[in-house]
Amino acid sequence: MYNFDRKVSPYNVDNMSILEMETSLTTEDRDRLEKYRTYWNFYEGYHWEGLGESDKPQITENYCRRFVDKFVSFELGGGFTISVPFEQEDAEKTETPINDFLDEIWNDNKRDALCIELGQSKSITGDAWVQVRYERPEQIVDPYGEYPDGRIRVEVIPTNIIFPLYDSHDKDKLIQVTVAYPIDVYEKQGKIFTKRTKTKKIFKQVWTEKTVVEYLGNEETKTFPNPYGIIPFVQIKNVPLVGRNVGVSDLEDIIPLNMELNFKKSDISEIIDYHSSPVTIIYGAKVSALEKGANKVWGGLPKDARVQNLEMNSDLGASVGYISQLKTALHEIGCIPEGALGGNQAISNTSGVALQFVNMPLIERTRIKRMNTEEGIRKINKMILLIGLTEELISVPEGVKSKDFFNTEITFTDTLPKDRLIELQQIQLELQLGLESKQGAMRRLNKDNITYLLEEIEQERLEEEAKALELQQKQAVMNAETQMMASAVQSKLGASQTPKLNSGMTNGETPVEQVRKETTGSNGMSNE
């Protein structure tokens, strides 16, 4: 529905614009938007907002961005693969129209970039909202004719413009979703001399299972039925919390520690600046009588005069130690080992088990995050298939149950580095023992298009067997011809003659040479 031109898009809107213009927001929504604004400020490096002006140095070490980027990379950096269970039962023979359709939709919506946006929204705000919608051919700018039947869009909607309403008795049941953001509206004023003035109004789109209503300001502009019977929005929580409809942000516990770290680093910076150009204290003399500058010599001072720089009587060891403790707490509470962010660590031929143990906090956190992401992607796939059926972009294969048609499995790529040779040896052993299938082995190796790859391998195997059979047949023919020639020689020599063996040859001659000798009188090897 975001297909008309606007100066302000739903992707660059500021939370404050909605807070200032929308008076119908609940206290809960206002608090949520304020929290989102704080999270985004810290991610973008604005750590000193709202603290007032100061002459002190403002050192900013943005660990919030580094932590979020690491979480996103570790969880979704390798992407994911989709499989349809009933299509994988006989992967070497069965076609996969549903899997191919889903892969086509995700790839058309830039799957990798979508994963990054999804991960950022989850990690920063605690939630990611994804909308699945259909664009008709007349709504698409398609100069290359790539979408004659329209296209299905999958978009990550900013959480600061989504206002969900849940059932009072079921916190997981979504009964209404409102998308609201300010847009620029041009209005004509005056009867004789008209001019266009630009004002901001809130555009709202209210989705229920039956209808979709659009508002511009307080005026209802459009109402149309919901053709899908579902609310095509999916909420993916970052980390769930019992009793709450929103997820937990990865920055919730990191921000206070990052602020304290910046404060103490700024204090140390101020101390260093102070002692690099210290204050000079003069006792018993006038400053005007002393010449300032480098390589100057002061003489003729009064007897009791004294000049010295203001010095620090204690070192910075305690401050540096406190900062070190803050960084340790930051990594422990943030669930990211210091080495994962590029810290110095001894790297050798580390085993996979040791590497997993070192990164265990990050792995455990990612495992929880992926549980919700996997379930959310499955819901998105169901919506894609339902919209595809409604818009006649796909059909249910004959004999396939509805439950099987909408059922998909999601597999994430393991982002921990592995020894490829050891992994292959382990897979080979499991295949020999019958503990693994070729399809499962390819999934573990992160192969794409497994079905087509298995078909290609099977075709190559059949071709190699055909070539081997042809070679065996040729060899058999050659052996038969040789045997026939040898038999002919034996029959001509007669049973009374006993051939002498020499180096494995009959009378020192090969069967071919013997035939030549019988027919021409010479075996062809003599120079006579």
Q: What is each model feature region?
A:
Residues 1, 130, 258-261, 377, ...:
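Short low-polarity hydrophobic stretches
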Residues 293-305, 314, 318, 325-528:
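C-terminal helix-loop subdomains that flank or include functional centers
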Residues 116, 122-242:
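Extended, regular secondary-structure scaffolds
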